[in-house]
Amino acid sequence: RALGPLIPSRLFDQFFGEGLLEYDLLPLFSSTISPYYRQSLFRSVLESGISEVRSDREKFTIMLDVKHFSPEDLSVKIIDDFVEIHGKHSERQDDHGYISREFHRRYRLPSNVDQSAITCSLSSDGMLTFSGPKVQANMDPSHSERPIP
C-alpha cells in the first residue's frame, strides 16, 4: 500500500544484515531533539535495501537495492507467474566483523506482462532493475459487455 500520493509502494524491512552503529544502541532519551525521536530508525530505513514495485499501463518494474551482493551472488528466475530473486554470499569481513547474507524475494507478475520481453540489469551502485512491457488485450470497443460473477 502506498504511503501517500508522492511515495510509491516500498518494502522497508530489507536491511540484509546491516551492522549496528554506536547510536543504534543508545537509549531513546539520549536524543537532544526530543525524548521520543530516534534518528537512527529513519536513517536505517533510508540507507537499507529498498524494494520498489511500479506498475503502469506500459510496463511492470521491480527495483531492488542489492548493493551487498555481487552479480555472481544473485539469481533471478521466472517461475509460473512469479519472479523470484535470490541473493546469497558466504561469510565476509566488513567494518563490524564477519557477516553472511541471504535473501529471497518473490513477486507476482501481472497477467498482461509479456514474459518473453522481460529484461533484468544490475547497475554499478547495486540497484537491480527487473522490467517487462505489458501487452494490451485486443478488445472490441463496440462490445464492452462483461459478466460480473
From Swiss-Prot:
The keyword Iron does not apply. Gene3D superfamilies: 2.60.40.790. Pfam families: Crystallin (PF00525), HSP20 (PF00011). GO terms for molecular function: metal ion binding; structural constituent of eye lens; unfolded protein binding. Residues 41-149 form the sHSP domain. The keyword Cytoplasm applies. InterPro entries: A-crystallin/Hsp20_dom, Alpha-crystallin/HSP_16, Alpha-crystallin/sHSP_animal, Alpha-crystallin_N, HSP20-like_chaperone. Its main location: cytoplasm. Keywords: Cytoplasm, Eye lens protein, Metal-binding, Nucleus, Zinc. Zn(2+) 1 binds at residues 89, 91. Zn(2+) 3 binds at residue 143. One of its GO terms (biological process) is protein refolding. SUPFAM superfamilies: HSP20-like chaperones (SSF49764). It is found in: Cytoplasm; Nucleus. GO terms for cellular component: cytoplasm; nucleus. Zn(2+) 2 binds at residue 96. Heteropolymer composed of three CRYAA and one CRYAB subunits. Inter-subunit bridging via zinc ions enhances stability, which is crucial as there is no protein turn over in the lens. Can also form homodimers and homotetramers (dimers of dimers) which serve as the building blocks of homooligomers. Within homooligomers, the zinc-binding motif is created from residues of 3 different molecules. His-89 and Glu-91 from one molecule are ligands of the zinc ion, and His-96 and His-143 residues from additional molecules complete the site with tetrahedral coordination geometry. Contributes to the transparency and refractive index of the lens. May act as a chaperone, preventing aggregation of various proteins under a wide range of stress conditions. Belongs to the small heat shock protein (HSP20) family. This is Alpha-crystallin A chain. It comes from Eudromia elegans (Elegant crested-tinamou).
